[in-house]
Amino acid sequence: MLSMRHSGYTLVELMVTVAVLSIIAGVVVPGARGFINHSILTKEINELSALARLARFKAMEEQTEVVMCPSSDYTHCISNWTYPSMAFYDVDGNGKRGTNETLLSSTEKLHSSVKIKAPSQALVFDARGGANVTTTLTICDDTSKADKAVGLIINGYGKIAIAQDSDDDGINENHAGAALSCS
């Protein structure tokens, strides 16, 4: 008697496979989202850091003021740091980019999933590299959790640093030593 062998999967095998894949997806997908959010925050803070460092360097190199600020038209500074940021020589010291004032560099608009807390005024680096304000630019992801926030610290001497967690509480600190906040 010949036995016929059927190839394929039983309903139970398919259900077990679907259950295992669902469990794996439930573990992997949230982790992937966290990784993506962290990557976006890192990119944004690194771009602002690079722009600030360039602005400070050029101010000292050319012995003139360099302004770093957000702008919607690459001419006028605005207070909304979600717009692209620019750095330019401010030869006449009026805080606006004139036709004879060189645009040194700019960043893209911030990713739509992040928000930023920053000073309402422009950052101005003088010929010695000092800044007009001591501040922290804080960038948060869409969860608004402080332990995910990143910060760019700029002090009056022009020192630029990425915020660190110096007290091991899981939250980076701002220029004053207080925990970064997303609210």
Residue ranges and their predicted role:
Residues 1-33:
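N-terminal single-pass transmembrane signal-anchor helix
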Residues 2-3, 27-57, 61, 65-183:
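N-terminal helix-rich module
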